[in-house]
Amino acid sequence: MEDFSSQEKLVETYLKENKKEQAVELLFNLIDQYAEARHFGKAESLRERLFEIDSMALDEIVKSADIIENAKMSAMDPAHTETWSHLYQHLTQEESIALYYGMQSAVYEPEQIIFQQGEMNPHLYLINAGRVKLFYHKDQHAILLNTLGPGELVGEDTFFTNSTCTASAMADSKVKLNIIEKSALHKWQSDEPNLVNKLQDYCSGLEPIKDLLQKKELERRTHPRHNISGSAAIKILDNKGSKVYKVDLSDISISGVSFIMNMSKTAADSLLGCRLNCKFTLRAAFSEISVDQEGCIVGVHGQLFNEYYINVKWEEPLDDGLLDRIKTFG
């Protein structure tokens, strides 16, 4: 960098001595060196200086723009561009550069809230690694809408509007994100308007939160629930060495089971999206039925005295014959 600084001073010396041609040549070489060193801001400011010194040095002005652009493309994280190839394939090289260098990077730890339902969120989040849970709160009820992973984004429902978030997002594991701020969107509207349109078109192709909510309600209505009593052993599969919890069964269907569990609100919210194993045995005078199923927690509903009504969706539907036998124990 010290050598760069001395060369910049030499440019000014050339100008004072009316050696414009030498100043342009040296400035062009400096732009190339800064771009190669990935100091893109400095390279761009020197290119502006080049234009000020000699606006007729068109060859150097055009070539320096290409040098910076190519260096920026080469410096883009290949893992990110591969993860988001389905987005970048719709963009020009200039738009790809504007998008990539217009984003910020962030890391969220497990159970850290990314944005909260009912609050303003001026960001769009692109997931590069990890899992994000999207859930909806109504009164004391929490419903898992979706679990998102690399190559998926979240926050699109409010990014292009001035409305509050209709759902909450929380890191389900350590999550690496790229964040687009609305200030970048406003800048692109003047500098890269097609990028804004393409990004909005891309987001409009995603399933809206209201549709996810309707789908959850339809799933709930499709398979009738049957009351069931007794206790079950629950083990959270996402946690290594997780202990077994004893819970009180409430109801069961082909697609899932519900039970009552005591815990804090924070712990309850963190369970959304977790995989579990559920074991229980129902006994009558001359028969018994054992169930050993794995599923995913899709709903958490607050009751009194730190009790929570937990909804689980089976990974594999319950056998019809087994359910018919369970119903006789009701």
Predicted regions and their residues:
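Repeat-based scaffolding regions
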Residues: 1-75
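Cyclic nucleotide-binding regulatory module and flanking cytosolic helices
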Residues: 62-110, 187-224
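Regulatory nucleotide-sensing modules
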Residues: 82-139, 259
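Cyclic-nucleotide recognition modules
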Residues: 145-199, 304
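A residue-level detector for short acidic-glycine micro-motifs
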Residues: 171-173, 251, 297-299
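C-terminal output/interaction extensions
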Residues: 180, 185-207, 301-330
